């Protein structure tokens, strides 16, 4: 790109990972954990250059001596001071850009509280002095990335899962459903069921090890009961994992019991429908005339949709809920882990989008509430 100096920045702040890069690129340049870590102990070595806080990968690598906090919970920012640190780290350390020289596209969870949106806008203009910014809904960007304008997106990340029906580019707010069950809950559940096997994982640092086990070894069973029977009768499903200290642990039915909670939240003690039923309920809240288009364009997105077997299982479950003649298509693009970011990159580089940005001037005239008028 020759005009790199005016490229818009696209920042997808997820509960678990932050994805950032330049509009027009086909993948984010920076991907790091949305973590701020603070030392657990008092420093005793002088001149070590110890900091009072660490962000992202650096916090991850020093996790043994830090207390790790995630400023975004269930897709919504709960700690603004830490969030500011993450944005600062994104601009200055990861992308190495001056935010006052680039428009910034941020993403937000559907049904985000209005005050949250305003606060994001305020920080961008007042702390980072961006010339222009925009806030886009994550699921809508995933649909853009799949090349569609109509469909239902089941977006499931680390902190929250949403089903968002979109028709001709418009999200249908009355039919958006939110499920507070996502990757972080699955990590916690895996910690719990591994403890039942006699392995102990308790600290915030150990949780990160379990997250790695989950990402490398878990999968979704097509038929849970049958898979349980197979696991009980043979060791064909067992896998081993080497912990950082060299100890090797074996994991069997936990591999599919963990993500099964997405389809059976009762496993986590939650009284709520699974992701398949939530998707179906969301479709049923839409006008009868557009349901057919939604069934045929069901798009999976987000890191928690990366389990092998999840698309086939969704197909099976939704087929059993929907009318028998209905054509159902589950779209699970291979790059779905980053499809929100990719959609943002596409959107921010469209020529028709350029008049959509909120400029510093508009912000100065109207204040943070401008975001509700300009960003849907």
From Swiss-Prot:
It is found in: Cytoplasm, Cytoskeleton. GO terms for cellular component: cytoplasm; cytoskeleton. InterPro entries: Actin (IPR004000), Actin/actin-like_CS (IPR020902), Actin_CS (IPR004001), ATPase_NBD (IPR043129). The keyword Transferase does not apply. It is an enzyme of class 3 (hydrolase). Belongs to the actin family. This is Actin-1. It comes from Saccoglossus kowalevskii (Acorn worm).
């Amino acid at each position: 790109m020759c005009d790199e100096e005016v490229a818009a920045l696209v920042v997808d702040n997820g509960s678990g990972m932050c994805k950032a890069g330049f509009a027009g690129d086909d993948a984010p340049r920076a991907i790091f954990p949305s973590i701020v870590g603070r030392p657990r102990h008092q420093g005793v070595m002088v001149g070590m250059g110890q900091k009072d806080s660490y962000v992202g990968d650096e916090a991850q690598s020093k996790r043994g001596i830090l207390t790790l906090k995630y400023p975004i919970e269930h897709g919504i920012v709960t700690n603004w001071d830490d969030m500011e640190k993450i944005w600062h780290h994104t601009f200055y350390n990861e992308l190495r850009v001056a935010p006052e020289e680039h428009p910034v596209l941020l993403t937000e969870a559907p049904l985000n509280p209005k005050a949250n949106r305003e606060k994001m806008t305020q920080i961008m203009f007042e702390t980072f002095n961006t010339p222009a910014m925009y806030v886009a809904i994550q699921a809508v960007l995933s649909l853009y990335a799949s090349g569609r304008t109509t469909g239902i997106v089941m977006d499931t990340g680390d902190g929250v899962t949403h089903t968002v029906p979109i028709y001709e580019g418009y999200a249908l707010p009355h039919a958006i459903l939110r499920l507070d069950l996502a990757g972080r809950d699955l990590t916690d559940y895996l910690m719990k069921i591994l403890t039942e096997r006699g392995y102990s994982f308790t600290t915030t640092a150990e949780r990160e090890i379990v997250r790695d086990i989950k990402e490398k070894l878990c999968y979704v069973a097509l038929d849970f009961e049958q898979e349980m029977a197979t696991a009980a009768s043979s060791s064909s499903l067992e896998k081993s994992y080497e912990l950082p200290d060299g100890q090797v642990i074996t994991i069997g039915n936990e591999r599919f019991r963990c993500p099964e909670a997405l389809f059976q939240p009762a496993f986590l003690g939650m009284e709520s429908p699974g992701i398949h039923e939530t998707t179906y309920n969301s479709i049923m809240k839409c006008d009868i005339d557009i349901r057919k288009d939604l069934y045929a364009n069901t798009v999976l997105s987000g890191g928690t949709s990366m389990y092998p077997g999840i698309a086939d299982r969704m197909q099976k479950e939704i087929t059993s809920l929907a009318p028998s003649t209905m054509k159902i298509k589950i779209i699970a693009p291979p790059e779905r882990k980053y499809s929100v970011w990719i959609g943002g990159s596409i959107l921010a580089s469209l020529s028709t989008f350029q008049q959509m940005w909120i400029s510093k001037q508009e912000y100065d005239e109207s204040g943070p509430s401008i975001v509700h008028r300009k960003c849907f």
